[in-house]
């Protein structure tokens, strides 16, 4: 049994192959990001209080609750690849101070500045809703060894069809609550518009 995680196990197998171990020619192929996306509903009509307060709490009187308590499932009996799941989430307290800065490049300047002054537990960030979604990508990622490091190649990963379907579904959910749909702020700044995943699979 090789249990070093998706990336670690693939790296061990690729290194072993280069040292003469007979392995399948599929090792390193068909990596999937699980069609994951993180997104936000900004400025909704209702107060959400989904930003963690830490312990001891930074602010009294807010009950944040668990990270995921609700889920929407979109089924498609004709095409399973089009199925997707959306969960609501909470932002950890450690991330709270950086939230306004994350949203500055995303056209939310006024609200971000307001929360920089008054904190994320008041103003527009009090109605910020976090969404985690999973779907089906084409599993087109390929791993290889680049010198001494594992490298991933996936042409046009950001243009996978599943992300457009997720955008459409999430936008509908967010707008029905009176908010504005905001994609993962870090994807466009820190990550160069590449997708992120919490569930690396295959390879």
Feature roles, as predicted:
Residues 3, 15-16, 34, 136, ...:
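Generic, well-ordered alpha-helical scaffold segments in large soluble proteins
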Residues 27, 35-36, 127-129, 201-202:
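Residues that flank catalytic or metal-binding motifs in active/ligand-binding sites
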Residues 145-149:
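Short acidic-glycine loop/turn motifs at beta-strand connectors
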Residues 135-142:
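Active-site beta-strand/loop architecture of penicillin-binding DD-peptidases
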Residues 129-132, 150-203:
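A glycine-rich dinucleotide-binding beta-alpha-beta segment and adjacent secondary-structure elements
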Residues 28-32, 120-124, 194-197:
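Short Gly/Pro-enriched turn/cap motifs at secondary-structure boundaries
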Residues 71-132:
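Alpha-helical membrane-targeting segments
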Residues 2-59:
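Glycine-rich loop(s) and the adjacent beta-strand/alpha-helix scaffold that form part
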């Amino acid at each position: 049994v090789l249990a070093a995680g998706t990336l670690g196990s693939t790296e061990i197998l690729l290194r072993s192959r280069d040292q003469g171990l007979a392995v399948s020619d599929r090792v390193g192929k068909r990596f999937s990001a699980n069609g994951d996306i993180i997104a936000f509903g900004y400025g909704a009509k209702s107060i959400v209080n989904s930003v963690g307060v830490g312990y001891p709490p930074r602010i009294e009187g807010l009950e944040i609750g668990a990270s995921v308590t609700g889920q929407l499932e979109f089924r498609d009996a004709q095409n399973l690849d089009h199925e997707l799941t959306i969960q609501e989430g909470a932002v950890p307290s450690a991330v709270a101070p950086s939230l306004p800065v994350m949203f500055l490049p995303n056209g939310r300047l006024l609200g971000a500045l307001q929360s920089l002054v008054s904190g994320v537990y008041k103003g527009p960030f009090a109605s910020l809703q976090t969404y985690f979604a999973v779907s089906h990508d084409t599993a087109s990622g390929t791993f290889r060894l680049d010198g001494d490091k594992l490298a991933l190649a996936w042409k046009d990963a950001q243009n996978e069809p599943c992300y457009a379907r997720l955008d459409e579904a999430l936008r509908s959910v967010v707008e029905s609550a009176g908010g504005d749909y905001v994609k993962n702020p870090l994807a466009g700044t820190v990550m160069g518009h590449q997708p992120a995943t919490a569930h690396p699979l295959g390879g």
